[in-house]
């Protein structure tokens, strides 16, 4: 890859004029382009690259709302997420604190971190404070916290930090910018302005505690509120001053974050450049625990396959994937919910290199599924398995030495016709309940061969057909942005 340009707007111009460029120096050109490494590289910024390596984590909404489980005074909450039940059901604070007494009665940080680890996840992101303002750590900023108000009386964030560190699981914090102990509860929209007293009297000291007392924090996930651009910059700066390697999400608002996040439960299957993360809950209607969710055994295989598909679709499209589970009020995870994530963890263990440590590729997404790469291998994730049907991938450079059903000794027939690779599926579906994986092995790292190439010289005009673009996670004034990549015949870098 040798040149990158940002193209903003809904469509690209018919031609791009790249001038002036310093005269590039080329080695002797081969007779045909050999392509570029198929793997989309990690960010060249160390902290971003380290975060991208995490790939897959557990999001966990846990607080006083978990004790309610979506019910108040014997009736099911009629509107809104259950973690916002205090506002939707107009629950008085004194009543709310009565429920807090029962919070985390059976909380076991070791068991939670083990579930995360055994599920193939690399980080745990938990709600340190949701919109209700109830702090889930031992804070000196308010008595409205789990240590002071629950019979549990301990700091679950400290316990999670200790136990997850033992297993190599990174810790991340969700932090709501709004605080219903100081603002009128408004669950209908993201309209709460942030006054200076809240900024300096609550948000700053609470962030200081969270980023000082619990070890390295992989990401700080802000949410809600209507801060000014200056306030957004200050919040991001506070985080970076305390922990320079902590990634800040885009919901700090006003383009002050380090990475983009979409809407709740928004999972894209389209490739996007730039650091980004998708979040999805096991039950899209609730992020905190909802006791009424369908946990019938007949629904389990559907949830497992949905999770696998969302995981593959996100990481193969260049993003991180955080999957949410809401523990019960006592701090335990429902057996159905933990069973879904651990089953997918077993699938990942059967295919240890297909996701973990693998990278998305430059290949345009084929109609039959998704692709990842690691080392000298490509990994195909076909959506369907049908004996005799083929998986065709154009623009493949390099020499294929073997194709097999990943995790087995079953080989598959294949042909290479120029830059077109065709694999024929055969035998029974190796993963009838989840997603099959095909391993394609090369004699060196696989390459992507663009269908159009151009030799770049000063003042060269390059048509839209001669670059390949990938949508950026960033948007500018509501328009989609694109990262455009150009490759010259010799695959040597052009430097400005």
Language-model features: locations:
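Intrinsically disordered, low-complexity segments enriched in polar/charged small residues
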Residues: 9-10, 21, 60
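C-terminal segment of classical bacterial N-terminal signal peptides
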Residues: 17-25
């Amino acid at each position: 890859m040798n040149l990158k340009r940002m193209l903003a707007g809904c469509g690209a111009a018919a031609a791009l004029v790249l001038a002036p460029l310093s005269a590039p120096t080329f080695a002797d050109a081969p007779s045909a382009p050999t392509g570029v490494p198929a793997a989309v590289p990690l960010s060249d910024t160390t902290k971003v690259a380290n975060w991208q390596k995490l790939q897959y984590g557990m999001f966990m909404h846990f607080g006083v709302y978990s004790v309610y489980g979506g019910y108040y005074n014997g009736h099911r909450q009629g509107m809104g997420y259950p973690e916002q039940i205090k506002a939707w059901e107009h629950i008085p604070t004194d009543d709310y604190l009565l429920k807090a007494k029962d919070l985390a009665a059976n909380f076991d940080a070791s068991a939670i971190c083990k579930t995360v680890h055994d599920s193939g996840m690399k980080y745990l992101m938990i709600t340190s404070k949701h919109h209700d303002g109830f702090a889930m750590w031992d804070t000196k900023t308010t008595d409205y916290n789990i240590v002071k108000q629950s019979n549990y009386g301990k700091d679950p964030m400290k316990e999670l930090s200790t136990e997850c560190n033992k297993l190599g699981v990174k810790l991340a914090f969700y932090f709501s910018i709004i605080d219903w102990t100081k603002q009128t509860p408004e669950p209908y929209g993201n309209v709460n302005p942030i006054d200076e007293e809240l900024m300096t009297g609550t948000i700053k000291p609470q962030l200081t505690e969270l980023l000082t007392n619990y070890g390295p924090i992989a990401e700080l996930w802000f949410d809600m509120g209507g801060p000014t651009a200056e306030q957004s910059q200050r919040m991001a700066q506070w985080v970076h001053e305390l922990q320079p390697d902590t990634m800040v999400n885009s919901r700090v608002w006003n383009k002050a974050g380090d990475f983009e996040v979409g809407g709740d439960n928004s999972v894209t299957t389209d490739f996007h450049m730039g650091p980004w993360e998708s979040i999805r809950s096991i039950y899209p209607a609730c992020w905190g625990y909802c006791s009424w969710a369908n946990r019938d055994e007949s629904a389990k295989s559907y949830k497992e396959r949905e999770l696998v598909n969302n995981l593959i679709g996100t990481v193969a499209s260049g993003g991180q994937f955080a999957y949410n589970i809401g523990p019960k009020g006592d701090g335990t995870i429902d057996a159905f919910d933990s069973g879904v994530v651990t089953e997918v963890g077993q699938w990942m263990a059967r295919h240890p290199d297909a996701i973990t440590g693998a990278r998305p590729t430059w290949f345009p997404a084929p109609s039959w599924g998704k692709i990842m790469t690691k080392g000298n291998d490509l990994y195909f994730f076909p959506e369907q398995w049908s004996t005799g049907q083929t998986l065709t991938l154009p623009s493949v450079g390099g020499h294929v030495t073997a194709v097999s059903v990943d995790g087995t000794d079953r080989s598959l027939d294949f042909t290479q016709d120029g830059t077109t690779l065709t694999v024929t599926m055969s035998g029974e579906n190796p993963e009838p309940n989840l997603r099959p994986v095909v391993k394609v092995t090369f004699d060196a790292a696989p390459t992507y061969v663009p269908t159009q190439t151009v030799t770049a010289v000063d003042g060269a005009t390059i048509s839209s057909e001669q670059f390949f673009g990938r949508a950026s996670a960033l948007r500018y004034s509501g328009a989609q942005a694109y990262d455009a990549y150009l490759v010259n015949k010799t695959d040597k870098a052009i430097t400005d």
